[in-house]
Regions:
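Residue-level signal for the short linker/turn that defines the boundary of a DNA-recognition helix
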Residues: 21-22, 47-50
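Short alpha-helical "recognition helix" segments of helix-turn-helix
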Residues: 27-28
Length: 84
């Protein structure tokens, strides 16, 4: 089964950072990385859960909520398996 990327986590992080008026440099400093790494994060559809957790804590915003909502929608849309 092919995995669908309905949620683009990198774009969500970039949008939230902008809404909060925080800079890429600020997030890079908080993560302990170079700002080019943050720009690379913005380009990713998905992230390692540990990195997403760190970013969620740093930015005080639970990015997992978006994934949970989308996952539940996909579960609900999936047909029930046929009983034997």
């Amino acid at each position: 089964m092919q995995q669908q990327h309905r949620i683009h986590v990198g774009k969500l992080i970039r949008e939230r950072l902008k809404e909060e008026g925080k800079s890429v440099v600020w997030l890079a400093q908080e993560l302990g990385c170079h700002r080019t790494n943050v720009y690379n994060i913005f380009e990713k559809n998905s992230l390692d859960t540990n990195i997403l957790r760190r970013i969620s804590i740093i930015m005080r915003h639970n990015f997992f909520d978006y994934l949970q909502e989308d996952t539940q929608k996909q579960i609900d849309a999936r047909p029930s398996p046929a009983l034997p």
